[in-house]
Amino acid sequence: MFLFALVYTAGTVSGMYGRGFGFLGFAMLVVTLIAECVVSKGSLSGIGRIVVLLILISSAVFATAQFRYASVDENRDSYMQYMTDEKSVIVWGKIYKTEYKYFSYRYYMTDCVVQPGYGKAFGRKISCGDVVVYCDSKSAHLGDYMKACGKIGLFKSATNEGEFDRARFYRSQGIDFSVNADSIKTSAGKHAWYYHGLEKLRDTLSASLLEVTDETTAGVLSSMLLGDKSYLDDEIKDLYQVSGISHILAISGLHISIVGMAFYKLLRKRRVSYTAAFVCSAALILSYAVMTGNAVSTRRAVGMFILTMLAAALGRCTDMLNSLGIMVIYLLWDNPMVLGYAGFVFSVGAILAIGIVTPVMSAPKGGKFWTSVSIQLPMLPVVAMNYYELPLFAVFVNLIVIPALPVVFISGLLASAAGCFGVMPGKLLVFPAFAALKLYEMLCGLVMKLPGASVITGAPDGYRIFLFYAVMSGFLVAFSLKKRAIECGLKEKGQILYSVQRVVCTAVLLAILFVKPKTAAQLDILDVGQGDGIFYRFESGTCIFIDGGSSDRKQLGENVIMPFLKYNGIQSISYWFVSHADSDHISGLSEVIDSGYTIEHIVVAEAAAKEEAMEELLFKAKEAEIDICLMSKGDSIEINDASGSHSTANEEADGIMCLYPGPSDTALDRNDMCLVLKLTDGRFSGIFGGDISSEVEKKLVNEYGDELSVDFYKANHHGSRYSSSADWIEALSPRWAAVSCAAENRYGHPADEAMDRLMDAKCRILYTMQSGQIKYKESAIYENNRQ
């Protein structure tokens, strides 16, 4: 079954990333039919017939997976074309999960039917995927049937590398869209007493935890035990993530095993039959799954537990990998899109590591260290793909964290139950969990202070992931043979050699992820809404950033800039240039400084350094021990190596030259004191002028003339009509230009007049509001990661 699960997954992947791969299934089927003809003539032995049969079944499984994905995808496309943002709809469905988050109630509905329009104009009713309804009040319960009237909210796709892709995330959950409800009506569903009881039990236990311990501890325990992340502290969540222990916050096989096995063994001690004990235990953990939100990892764990208990009840046995295979096929059949969900990949990947790698790589005499390594090493590419950084000390942290988890779980569970009857018993029972969680927090805090605790790797390329697992497979084969020899009585020398080989394996695999080839020069204009954010990496590897702010996108540094830098494997910025101190140019930079990310120098115009807003930014930078550089007209920073160097002599050298303002320049408008930069790197050159107006442009044209000629022009002031004058554009004569602004803004950017002047100059114009992030690399321009 495990083999067929691999084939089914491959079929789903081929459907997801290109129907063109369908020829593989067809080819497998043709080969199988030919082989079957040979078999029918008696040319093959019994083993040959089995091989042909396996190929035949695998071909059918592969084709079935492709067909299932295609049918689900096409069905979704058939009705999603009618769903647009802010469209009025009525939606009916059954609530399978409730959640309170960001000051609103969320109701997740399945078995949904949607009717576009309500009031006087109705469309036809359409069956659709799951829907999440946002409501200001708690007026519905788990298991209820709901009718919601409101407006559709489509989930936005990521427009920058590394940015959280809401559309992809919710699609992987089987959720099509959200509805901001104006009104809702509910009716009790079938077995409402059961669902209402589970919801009330969860809410009661969650409230009990808040009574018996502090909010931070209660938030972690509620997430671990009840799947309720309403009170989970964001700082704790981030700390666990960068330390490599965020997995403890999810309902997993450990929780299911503790609850289910404890109840099963209790019933068996009471001399309940195997069958009855199995049925009761299965009912308990299924109810637990429903109560905690029925997440993908929970369903996987529950399914594997039920298969194990069923085998025991029938007097048979099952193995981990085949149980996993059955659940993978079930989950992918139910929702093929789940393959794009990180939680699914982590859940399945961890079991694969335990079932395949751990038995081979763990020490013959049972070393816990190598057991921990064998679980986490295969997961490193998955972690890097999702978080773009790796916690190097996670192996050691988990050696302490995981053994204490049962204590935390049992203590928290008993405390939440006891707290319903009295605060004092709950406080006593929660103390072990409280102490363990504080130990976790302290341990993670100490580890994060160590150099290299979290290394930014960037999103690994496909070939590096393939190489990683290919090399690992080769090592595992070698380890398997070596371990078998040791278990057969090989001497101590063989055991030492085996340990050395494991160290070499770990080092080689880490090198595949960490060591990256030299990359080409790269320019990125990020989609920051109404603002600016520009990244450039020189051929030498030196990385700079220009501005980084937005007036309409909140938490820009956390949600856009930092994920972009991590995605691209940028471990530090050598020079961060600030054109001026308007919030739409520095809001994200301020957050990046607060995050502790490495910035070596912040460069500002000397003439504007005394402005109040700029002084506040520079004060924050000094507190973060970032070097402050003041730049004036004629100054340049040469980039001759990976470190860069300051100079005022060679204007032709690769680097950044300041064109404006000089020490004596003044202006009534802050925009006209922007740092104007000319970047030169080999054959590429560009002009970045912040928000300067046509008056400053005129000064620069008069002073520099043809020296302003460049390949690329970052349109001044987001494409304002008062910038990008005809003389300025003629002097620059750029091949292409980028305009950074929001699709909807109160300034009228970009102005038709300015764009007309650029088009008259035969300049190709790209807009972040249309193209998302714009990338220039190896003489090619990419919009939304497409050339």
Regions of interest found by a model, annotated:
Residues 601, 697-772:
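Cap/insert and terminal regions of metallo-dependent hydrolase folds
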Residues 1-78, 300, 484-491:
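N-terminal leader/targeting segments
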Residues 5-9, 294-488, 692, 700, ...:
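Internal transmembrane alpha-helical bundles of multi-pass membrane proteins
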Residues 245-270, 572-594, 716-727:
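Di-metal (Zn2+ and/or Mg2+/Mn2+) metal-binding site signature of metallo-dependent hydrolases
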Residues 539-544, 549-609, 703-720, 733-738:
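Active-site metal-binding motif and surrounding structural segment of the metallo-beta-lactamase
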Residues 332-340, 445-575, 622-709, 770-787:
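Core dinuclear metal-dependent hydrolase active-site scaffold
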Residues 6, 172-304, 309, 524, ...:
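Aromatic-rich juxtamembrane segments at the membrane interface
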Residues 58, 62-247, 558-559, 563, ...:
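Membrane-interface helix/helix-cap signal primarily in integral membrane proteins
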